[in-house]
From Swiss-Prot:
Keyword Repeat appears in the UniProt entry: yes
Domain BTB: 36-104
Gene3D superfamilies the UniProt entry points to: 1.25.40.420, Kelch-type beta propeller, Potassium Channel Kv1.1, Chain A
Residue stretches making up the BACK domain: 139-240
Keywords tagged on the record: Kelch repeat, Repeat
Official protein name in the record: Kelch-like protein 23
Classification via Pfam families: BACK, BTB, Kelch_1, Kelch_KLHDC2_KLHL20_DRC7
Source taxon at top rank: Eukaryota
Protein species of origin: Mus musculus (Mouse)
Start-end of each Kelch repeat: 274-320, 321-369, 370-416, 418-466, 467-508, 510-557
């Protein structure tokens, strides 16, 4: 009997727990062997009793198999070749639980199976796992793997490492086994990070000499792809010294001719990276993003930082993304834990997950596919806490505390080790710290490795040619530290004193941007470049405006 006057009353009920309960019920059916209507069999003979509807809901492969006019449509048992039972078990469990465990041991086999069986979400998760663990040791193999399985993000990011760190890549054992086609692909990249002819000729000679009988004729083609000037004297010397090539004088002369007169060679400098200037300070916080190509000396402006009232933040880049972490507001000195992420490909900002600890005047670096935030200030005192953001897990995780909390220090990464140099210590920066702290992520441990000859704060550090270079600060002194030899040496002094400047490695040189000159009492707009071969600094351009405390990173666009 209808309630009087309520005939049009409708209540739309939705049980939010129903999807979970539904999945749990099918998981129970699977575990108990209830209502199953299809059996999957591995090459090892292990079988899994499943439900067609569940498999079809997760896999386009099984959906097509069970709905199209195929013989498997009517079979009760499907034999799957080439898939290990552990991998198939993981995919079947995923179908019933929405969860799967991905490890370094199983990720490639799991991606291959997910690609074959079209478990698209699992394939994407495996791809992101591999991107997270990319490095110079595996980027060549991962690039080929990504091409074969059509993993666009993995292909792009492995190519980014391959091109941006080519000098390190070609010294890996994996490089000697690459195919001619892969080598030609590498050499044909317009953004390949090579700036000197020996930097590209040496890997060509090394690769050829590794299998001289089968590769000697390939060298004609390889040399023709080198898009920089080739000195015939150098080429002749390099080929002649590589005795394993067993080249006659006539063949060397022929190689030189072909290298200097190729069909498709365009002799030009390669722009290997683009500089990004993020925010900064000029009497007040700056919110602009400026982008510079050093070859054309052209500046363009990107999307502004959404949170434009902060200063003294940390900036680092991971792939195409630039992370801005922490800082403090101009109207107070309360440390911030907020994070903003700038995507250089889309020219857009998104807010990231907040850090575990608020901090300002801290160091930010990238290591092993993660973003690290180290030390800094909080409530006027230097903080020892350090943490990292794992983009795959989408969370910040703590690491061991620093030996000494420092603010306004500098940090960089060399050979998978983080170095934190100098900075302020003591309440409100009452002391300058003279030690270099290093962090080994494999054992989650900090060490004191050396003392700086000139303790400083507000300076920058960059890794270059297996050494650390320290620039900026209150003096023009430039120092170079060799971790392997544990030795310091001074190089040519800079042209300006640059407190809280920016510094990056681009095109085989060190670029230092902006800063504040205490001797002149002015903010600086100029850009200095250091050529390590000449041991010389020169002014090469200007920032769009004078500034200090800005982010300065380079992104290899692919």
């Amino acid at each position: 009997m209808a309630l009087k006057g309520q005939e049009d009353y409708i209540f739309h009920f939705k049980d939010s727990s129903h999807p979970v309960d539904f999945l749990d019920a099918f998981r129970t059916f699977y575990m108990d062997g209830l209502f199953t209507d299809i059996t999957l069999q591995c090459p090892s003979g292990i079988i899994f009793h499943c439900h067609r509807a569940v498999l079809a809901a997760c896999s386009n492969y099984f959906k097509a198999m069970f709905t199209a006019d195929m013989k498997e449509k009517f079979k009760s048992k499907i034999k799957l070749s080439g898939i290990h039972h552990d991998i198939l078990e993981g995919l079947v469990n995923y179908a019933y639980t929405s969860q799967i465990e991905i490890t370094k041991r199983n990720v490639q086999s799991l991606l291959e199976a997910a690609d074959l069986l079209q478990f698209l979400s699992v394939k994407k998760a495996c791809e992101q796992f591999l991107v997270r663990h990319l490095d110079i040791d595996n980027c060549i193999g991962m690039h080929s793997f990504a091409e074969f399985h059509v993993c666009s993000e993995l292909e792009k990011e492995s190519r980014r490492i391959l091109c941006s760190r080519f000098k390190e890549v070609w010294q890996q054992e994996e490089f000697l086994e690459i195919s001619l086609e892969k080598f030609l692909f590498i050499l044909s990249r317009k953004n390949l990070s090579v700036w000197k002819e020996e930097a590209i000729l040496e890997p060509v000679i090394k690769w050829t000499a590794h299998d001289v009988e089968n590769r000697i004729e390939c060298i004609y083609n390889l040399l023709s792809y080198i898009n920089i000037d080739i000195d015939p004297v150098y080429l002749k010397t390099a080929l002649g010294l590589q005795r394993s090539c067993l080249l006659t004088e006539n063949k060397i002369r022929s190689l030189i001719y072909n290298a200097l007169n190729p069909m498709h060679k365009e002799i030009s400098q390669r722009s290997t990276a683009t500089m990004y200037i993020i925010g900064g300070y000029y009497w007040h916080p700056l919110s602009e993003v400026h982008i510079w190509d050093p070859l054309t000396n052209v500046w363009i402006q990107g999307a502004e930082i959404p949170d434009y009232t902060r200063e003294s933040y940390g900036v680092t880049c991971l792939g195409p993304n630039i992370y801005v972490t922490g800082g403090y507001r101009t109207d107070n000195i309360d440390a911030l834990d907020t994070v903003w992420i700038y995507n250089s490909e889309g020219d857009e900002w998104t807010e990231g997950l907040p850090m575990l600890n608020a901090r300002y005047y801290h160091c930010a670096v990238t290591l092993g596919g993660c973003v690290y935030a180290l030390g800094g200030y909080r409530k006027g005192a230097p903080a020892e806490e350090a943490e990292f953001y794992d983009p795959l897990k989408e969370k910040w995780l703590p690491i061991a505390n620093m030996i000494k909390g420092v603010g306004n220090a500098t940090a960089c990464v060399l050979h998978e080790v983080i170095y934190v140099i100098g900075g302020h210590c003591g309440y409100r920066g009452s002391c300058t710290y003279d030690k270099v702290q290093s962090y080994n992520s494999d054992i989650n441990e900090w060490s004191l490795i050396t003392a700086s000859p000139h303790p400083e704060y507000g300076l920058c550090s960059v890794p270059f040619e297996n050494k650390l270079y320290l620039v900026g600060g209150q003096t023009t002194i430039t120092e170079c530290y060799d971790p392997e030899q544990n030795e310091w040496r001074e190089t040519a002094p800079m042209m300006e004193r640059r407190m809280e400047c920016g510094a990056v490695i681009m095109n085989g040189c060190i670029y230092v941007t902006g800063g504040y000159s205490y001797s002149k009492g002015t903010y600086l707009q100029s850009i200095e470049k250091y050529d390590p071969d000449l041991n010389k600094w020169e002014i090469v351009g200007n920032l769009p405006s004078a500034m200090r405390s800005h982010g300065c990173v380079c992104v290899y666009n692919v």
